[in-house]
Amino acid sequence: MRSSSRFERTLVLGVAFSLLLTIAGSLPARAQEKTLYERIGGYNALAAVVDDFIVRLVSDKQFEKFFAGHSTDSKKRIRQHILDQFCAATGGPCVYTGRDMKTSHAGLGITDADWDAAAKHLAASLDKFKVPEREKGEVLAFVTTLKKDIVEK
């Protein structure tokens, strides 16, 4: 009789454990934190911010010297590189295939004042599209990591 009650307890525990696993498996998994890319709104949202940012840069007399002589095609390529870099850096599916920042900005003579003005334009573009403060801060923090390779003077 004793071995039968041990068997019953083992059987009951086994069934209970199986039932618990079945129930736990049917519960939704704890939501994983969304990437910055997802929180911003994905590719189209990033593209809108980048497009606005580029319009601001190209329209600013301070940046004329950097864009003078570039063809429309060249400007489109620069835009795509910026978009791909932001997309990849925010956790999106894009792959940045451009040159490293130091190489692509070498010889341009970008100053701290240029950097600060560009950062203000980017912040204004993020504000225009109502990117929340947390996400805006993360984008600007990423861009700040590039400063040492972009600013020459």
For each of these PLM feature ranges, what is it?
Residues 8-9, 22, 30:
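Low-complexity, intrinsically disordered segments with a bias for serine/threonine
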Residues 1-8:
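N-terminal secretory signal peptides that target proteins for export/translocation
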Residues 27-153:
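Core of compact, soluble alpha-helical bundle domains
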Residues 12-24:
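Bacterial N-terminal signal peptides
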Residues 3, 22-26, 141:
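A general, composition-driven signal for non-globular sequence regions
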